């Protein structure tokens, strides 16, 4: 199954749980793409020892998951894109939604 996950929260626990879910889906042999938008592009900065968002994202990428992030949202926060938060577009999000069998939002 193809699963799209859209994360627009910068709450550490919410981002952490969304990424844990993404990792769980990969372990079920699903194809998973995560798109960060709005406050969600801040996920690397909001992680804590208890809710380590970067660790979950790293595990996700190393397991074959794909991460996308709204370029406009990144620029609005004066951030730069990176491997863990690559600059993407609304067209990318559209394609994820269009191609996914299921879309989950956080």
PLM region descriptions:
Residues 14-27:
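Histidine-anchored nucleotide/phosphate-binding helix
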Residues 29, 64, 100-101:
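Short, well-ordered alpha-helix to beta-strand connector turns
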Residues 38-41, 74:
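Short beta-alpha junction loops
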Residues 3-16, 41-48:
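Short, glycine-rich nucleotide/cofactor-binding loops
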Residues 75-106:
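C-terminal structural segments of small proteins and small subunits
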